[in-house]
Amino acid sequence: MSSLNLSAGPEPVSERPDDAAAIEAETRLRNDIRLLGRILGDTVREQEGQSVFDLVENIRQTSIRFHRDDDKTARAELAAILDGMSIQDTMRIVRAFSYFSHLANIAEDQNNIRQMRAGSTAGSAPRAGLLAKTLAHARQEGISAAELRKFFATALVSPVLTAHPTEVRRKSTMDREMQIAGLLDQRDRVQLTADEWTDNEERLRRAVETLWKTNLLRRTKLTVLDEVTNGLSFYDYTFLREVPRLHSALEDRLADAAKAEGANAEGELASFLRMGSWIGGDRDGNPFVTAEVLHGTLKLQSTRVLRYYLEELHELGSELSLASHLAGTTDTVKALAETSPDTSPHRKYEPYRLAVSGIYARLAATALKLEVENLRAPVGEAEPYASAQDFKADLDAIHLSLTTHHSGVIARGRLRQLRRAIDCFGFHLASLDMRQNSAVHERTIGELMDAARPGTSYAVLDEDARIALLISELRSTRPLTSMFVKYSDETVGELAVFREAAKAHATYGAAAIPQCIISMTKGVSDLLELAVLLKEVGLIDPSGRSAINVVPLFETIEDLQACAKIMDRLLSIPEYRRLVDSRGSVQEVMLGYSDSNKDGGFVTSGWELYKAEIGLIEIFEHHGVRLRLFHGRGGSVGRGGGPSYDAIVAQPGGAVNGQIRITEQGEIITSKYSNVEVGRNNLEILAAATLEASLLQPKRVAPHRDYLEAMEQLSALAFKAYRGLVYETDGFVDYFWASTVINEISTLNIGSRPASRKKTRAIEDLRAIPWVFSWAQCRLMLPGWYGFGSAVSAWVTEHPEKGIAFLQAMYQEWPFFRTLLSNMDMVLSKSSIGIASRYAELVEDTAIRDRIFSRIRAEWHSSIDYLLAIMQQDHLLQSNPLLERSIRHRFPYLDPLNHVQVQLLREHRTHDPDEQVLRGVQLTINGISAGLRNSG
């Protein structure tokens, strides 16, 4: 065998004979996988020997037989092979299959980029999900360029990066993989000579060998500031350049559209795409996010953006070599030039360069004031900028001077992008949300109230009494805290964080921390408690002015059902309504997909979220307040994941209304934004979907009443089935902890936050992320489908006159139901009941194992059967051939990792603790996560 069959891949996917583009894309993808697989195979043979190479191939072939045919002989052979391996060989096997998953992902991403480029060539029809297509749709609907500009003037599209621990890759690994991606891209884009082709492959070999010799796992646990630093790397990769470019491209498209309409494009497009972050501000369940960490986070963010501005100013100064006698200047630019510290006689007659050097000096002084260290070049004394707006005003003056003096083309280059970047990123880079659990706010307020008003006993007050007390405190001008009272460590820590937030507003501007989120919001008092705490540090004024948004997060099924009533009562309180009005009469509400799914299952969670939005829309319209929804979606379908475009346009009419915030979590950040072209595409998808859902979706017919009624019935039936298994079946907790890697996940150094809220085994206390992540690892993906089959079966039995035909029509005509089922199709395609059966064998109590797994297996088959019947498909992913091909390419190399993981789990749990065995389990978790791509 000359090369590892990692390069062979599955059998070619059959395409229609006339689908030449698809066939070519498939061929090129297979070629890339073959190339990387061959290089990896050579590396394994050279570094580990022929015997390890042969062992990898033997396991791969046996695993394919087991997966394809549920071959019992293959199952026994696989067990024998794995039993006979040393721990050293096991680690090598795991690393080989893990790295193949990583390399296959790179090849797949490159193929997606290739297809994006093919669809963006001159003369090609715009693709769905991109702005060109949405703008064309708007024109067809008679929406003018001026109306679109007006829409974007008040629009907000905000991806919010979070540090949820589902990204298991180290940055060292990601950097090397980006190098490999760049080399593949070079083979696509550049006409290489024979020598260059050879050099390219040699560099690929070096990169793969370096990967092979790099630790896949972190040796130490991440700190919060480590997570912040990791998150900031995506600004270098994508956001700092692509956010301004997206605005410029859209601005140009609208200008062209206005010209075609015979109108003038007035002014610049408003900045609507703004980055957000939870990393360093999310305290819910994370005791390591303190006032000091908040300060450090903001400093790191500011350092990153100021260094970028300084680098761009340096380049801009090099570019603007315009001589004064060849290019005119305004008096403002002349004044800027006169303040420049640059005294070189060579630049005496280059006013634009002098102006930029003066701006550079002021920005460098600003950076020093904001504690930025290791500046690129020392400068003379200069006055720091008071704000990012003042900095931009100087660049605006240069822009005006250039355009006034016939140099508009020059103004549209680096200067245009830098001005837009300042508008989007300010001196703070990303808007940092603060988040804390309502129970913590309640304890803090209770302690403060009881000290300030002896005899209050806040903890035992009912909701009405709490509301009355909190309203009176909001009106009060006296402080609630006292320097003469010794408070608990928790209260001292909470107040310190709020005071640090107030300092951040003074230092970086209000955009640095614009939101404060209350997780597990259950009543009006939860929001008023936070408002009182913010008033205590000056972020809210007793007169009714607020410098920050108070945002409820509704997470459980019960809370989603109550959220409209809660917000109705809240907005009816004059003291709170004044705060909302001071924020432009906009109230943000966050909806949690993760906990609602863990609480009620996939079907019920999706439906209750949809109904909650409808209820909120009606209440907010009644109060005359603009609703902005913040969607707390995870990477996996079980936590609200799935294609962003489909999810946004499937929202009920009026839910988006020009403004949306959406979390980007864990491994999804890497897959969406580590590559600049993929990142640009994903940012554009968010903008296009927001426009589509806001301006074009309301023209659609509302869902048929019969569909709403059927969905309510299906949800109730699915809820009963899901709760019946997860919360009401004796032994289920034992089954879950024994048949998944939930115990072992906590040993991974992939995040700063604990996996459970409390130190119990109860499902209620487990965080949604490890819950979903664990089911993904054992390939059941249970949170993404369980209960659907039972629900449809019961519904069809109860409604024989409607039957499956009614649900088929519902799927075809209702975007919400179609998106729900499409996401289920995706998650079921990644599941494997055969592999899951091997994890079930880890449950020592055979009665519990057989009873529970038989229920899961029956529901899995039932859910697939009914899903295919409703979607009118012969097999899973029939309507998504791109993902089907992806899975067919990658999963023959993913499945062996599951088999090895089961073997290692058994050994880890039945023998004395062995660091190598545990590390082997951790490596399999890494590899499986990479292969699944959206596992948490």
Swiss-Prot record:
The UniProt entry, under InterPro entries, shows: PEP_COase (IPR021135), PEP_COase_bac/pln-type (IPR022805), PEP_COase_Lys_AS (IPR018129), PEPCASE_His_AS (IPR033129), Pyrv/PenolPyrv_kinase-like_dom (IPR015813)
Question: Which superkingdom is the protein from?
Answer: Bacteria
For this protein, what is the EC number? 4.1.1.31
What cofactor is needed? Mg(2+)
Active site, per annotation: 164, 598
List, alphabetically, the Pfam families matched.
PEPcase (PF00311)
A GO BP entry is:
tricarboxylic acid cycle
Mention any one GO cellular component term assigned to this protein in its UniProt record.
cytosol
- State if Lipid metabolism is listed as a keyword: no
Q: What class of enzyme is it?
A: lyase
Can you state which reaction this protein catalyses? Answer: oxaloacetate + phosphate = phosphoenolpyruvate + hydrogencarbonate
On whether Heme is a keyword of this UniProt record, the answer is: no
Q: Which GO terms describe its molecular function?
A: magnesium ion binding; phosphoenolpyruvate carboxylase activity
What keywords would UniProt list here?
Carbon dioxide fixation, Lyase, Magnesium
Q: Where is this region: Disordered?
A: 1-20
Q: Member of which family?
A: Belongs to the PEPCase type 1 family.
Describe the function of this protein: Forms oxaloacetate, a four-carbon dicarboxylic acid source for the tricarboxylic acid cycle.
Q: What is this protein called?
A: Phosphoenolpyruvate carboxylase
Q: What organism does the record attribute this protein to?
A: Rhodopseudomonas palustris (strain ATCC BAA-98 / CGA009)
UniProt gene name: ppc
